[in-house]
Amino acid sequence: WQSREQAAELLRPKGFYQHFEGDCFQAYIDHALMDDPLRGGVELTIPKMDEVNIFRTNPSLWWLPQVKPQVPVHLVVAEKGPFLARKFPQQVQKKFDIPFEVFKGGHMFPLEHPVEVVNLVKQLIQTPA
């Protein structure tokens, strides 16, 4: 992008970003982009292919026996995210006895509903297991 302003203008209407709360979107523009010293303008701080490679090379040992967590855990998943549709929370609950909660919004729900997510996390931390 030629500037942070242009990036914001082009990214805001896209599905991934369009529901970000205003301050969260601005923080994304301020901190997820960096100046591009070679071409000018700005680019993502973490290149898209680096993110793809993280998920591509992240091995899943799900099928192996695993020890249940020794600390209290509570999973929060997005109502419209990919994990609920694939029944991942139900699998985690069955395998590890980890409760889960479905929260409104998409995959990036903490940036869509930051105040509500903070309140939920505080409530979960203060509630005895």
Where are these regions (language model features)?
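Helix-rich cap/lid subdomain of alpha/beta-hydrolase
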Residues: W1-R39
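Catalytic histidine-centered segment of alpha/beta-hydrolase-like enzymes
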Residues: G105-V118
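C-terminal alpha-helix
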Residues: L120-P128
